[in-house]
Design a protein with these regions (language model features):
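FAD-site-proximal beta/loop scaffold in flavoenzymes
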Residues: 1-6, 98-169
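Cofactor-binding loop segments of dinucleotide-utilizing enzymes, especially the Rossmann-like FAD-
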Residues: 14, 37-41, 164
C-alpha cells in the first residue's frame, strides 16, 4: 500500500482533494508536506458585494491544513526529478496571472525535495487549442463552452457541450446529470425522437 510515512510529500492542487491529501499525509507520519497551487493566493476575506450569489473567493484553511503543511500559490510544476526509478524532487517556477493566463517569472525556478507527489489538480477551464479552436464554438465570459441547458447545443450546428466543459468546475454529479441530458439531446437531434431518460 502507498504510505506517506517518513516521506517528503508534495500535493499538487489547492482544493478540497488537495486538503484531504495533506491531512492523510500528516496522519500517516510524513516528514514534510508541501501543497502547491497554480492559482494566485486568494484574499483572506471575500468581497461580499462582488461574490454574491456565487461561491466566495477567499483563502480557506481546513483542519487538514492546521495539522501542518507548507502552502504555496502561483507555482507551476515543470518536471519531476528522479533517481533509479524513485522520485527525488520537483522542479517548479513562479508565475504571474493577468486574469486569464499566466507567464513564468524569469529567474524564479526552484526545486523541492520530494519522495511522494500526489496529484489533486482541479479544472481551470477547457483547453481551447485544438478541437475548440477548430470547431469555432463561442465561449462564455468565464471561458467555458457556451451551450444552452435544454438542448446543450452550442452556436455551431451539431456541436454539443455539457458538464465541466459547459458549466466549469463542479461536482461530478452535475457532470453525470448533464451528460445524460446531453446524450438525450444528441439522440433527439440525430434521430428526431428519443426514448432516453431525462
Amino acid at each position: 500500500t502507498l504510505s506517506a510515512k517518513g516521506k517528503h510529500v508534495i500535493v499538487i492542487g489547492g482544493g478540497d482533494t488537495g486538503s484531504d491529501c495533506v491531512g492523510t499525509s500528516n496522519r500517516q507520519g510524513a516528514a514534510s508536506v508541501t501543497q502547491l497551487e497554480i492559482m494566485p493566493k486568494p484574499p483572506e476575506k471575500e468581497d461580499k458585494a462582488m461574490t454574491w450569489p456565487h461561491w466566495p473567493l477567499k483563502l480557506r484553511t481546513s483542519s487538514s491544513h492546521e495539522e501542518g503543511a507548507e502552502r504555496d500559490w502561483a507555482v507551476l510544476t515543470k518536471r519531476v526529478v528522479g533517481e533509479n526509478g524513485d522520485v527525488t524532487g520537483l522542479e517548479c517556477v513562479r508565475i504571474e496571472w493577468d486574469g486569464r493566463s499566466f507567464e513564468e517569472v524569469p529567474g524564479s525556478e526552484f526545486t523541492l525535495k520530494a519522495d511522494l507527489i500526489l496529484l489533486a489538480m482541479g479544472f481551470t477551464g477547457p483547453k481551447r487549442r485544438g478541437l475548440l479552436d477548430k470547431a469555432g464554438v463561442a465561449l462564455c465570459e468565464r471561458g467555458n463552452v457556451k451551450a444552452d441547458t435544454q438542448r446543450y447545443a452550442t452556436d455551431q450546428d451539431g456541436v454539443f457541450a455539457c458538464g465541466d466543459m459547459r458549466r466549469g468546475q463542479s461536482l461530478v454529479v452535475w457532470a453525470i446529470r448533464e451528460g445524460r441530458q446531453c446524450a438525450r439531446a444528441v439522440d433527439e437531434a440525430l434521430m428526431g425522437v428519443t426514448d432516453l431518460p431525462r
